[in-house]
Structure formats: structure tokens, C-alpha cells
Amino acid sequence: INWKKIKSIIKAAMN
């Protein structure tokens, strides 16, 4: 599981 990718997606979803 790519945590960096997940974090990026979460950040994008928060925006």
C-alpha cells in the first residue's frame, strides 16, 4: 500500500 499516494488523495479530497 502506497501511503504517500493515499495521503495525497486524502489531501486532494480535503481541498
Swiss-Prot record:
Biological process annotations from GO: defense response to bacterium; defense response to fungus; innate immune response; killing of cells of another organism
UniProt keywords, alphabetically: Amidation, Antibiotic, Antimicrobial, Fungicide, Immunity, Innate immunity, Membrane, Secreted, Target cell membrane, Target membrane
Feature type site, description May enhance the stabilization of the helical conformation but leads to a lower membrane selectivity compared to its homologs that do not have a C-terminal Asn: N15
Annotated positions of the Asparagine amide modification: N15
Known tissue expression: Expressed by the venom gland.
Entry keyword Membrane: yes
Highest taxon above the source species: Eukaryota
Known function: Antimicrobial peptide with high activity on Gram-positive (S.mutans, and S.aureus), and Gram-negative bacteria (S.enterica), as well as on fungi (C.albicans, C.glabrata, and C.neoformans). Shows a potent hemolysis on human erythrocytes. Together with phospholipase A1, stimulates prostaglandin E2 release from murine peritoneal cells and macrophages.
UniProt name for this protein: Mastoparan-V1
Phylogenetic classification of the source organism: Eukaryota, Metazoa, Ecdysozoa, Arthropoda, Hexapoda
